[in-house]
């Protein structure tokens, strides 16, 4: 079974249907029906007529199911060294057990507290001597006389 295509609309023409039109220059056209033939002879552009295949192709109609979904690029995790720490050090820290990490943290906190105490101990004697000299130089505070409000005039409000 030979199926032809309509020269105007682009639809299939099955055997026993359609019309054949031969021009004087020898070119042969197949039309699905009289509607297509008359539109062709009136020199209408099939790309501007809504129901033709050429129009649908031009305006991208009905191709949504054929189009494959666009692939989005996925972010891939990649491990590399950071300034001040090599990759081996980072991996070693990551693979440590939580108990070991907790012990290290507590030790670091203890060391920081001790250094803070040592700093304060060096500061205290100097600060204490400064305070004693300041206390002797202070003047005694004099109590300010309180203002006594004047008696109200005009009776009951």
UniProtKB/Swiss-Prot annotation:
Protein keywords: Cytoplasm, Ribonucleoprotein, Ribosomal protein
Source superkingdom: Eukaryota
MF (Gene Ontology): mRNA binding; structural constituent of ribosome
One cellular component (GO) term of this entry: cytosolic large ribosomal subunit
Localization annotation: Cytoplasm
Pfam families: Ribosomal_L24e (PF01246)
InterPro entries the UniProt entry points to: L24e/L24_sf (IPR038630), Ribosomal_eL24 (IPR056366), Ribosomal_eL24-rel_N (IPR000988), Ribosomal_eL24_CS (IPR023442), TRASH_dom (IPR011017)
Subunit and partners: Component of the large ribosomal subunit.
Family label: Belongs to the eukaryotic ribosomal protein eL24 family.
Name of the protein: Large ribosomal subunit protein eL24
Major place of residence: cytoplasm
GO biological process: one example: cytoplasmic translation
GN (gene name): rpl24
Ranges of compositional bias, category Basic and acidic residues: 96-117
Xref: Gene3D superfamilies: 6.10.250.1270, Ribosomal protein L24e
Biased composition (Low complexity): 123-140
Role according to the record: Component of the large ribosomal subunit. The ribosome is a large ribonucleoprotein complex responsible for the synthesis of proteins in the cell.
Entry keyword Phosphoprotein: no
Positions of the UniProt region annotated as Disordered: 94-157
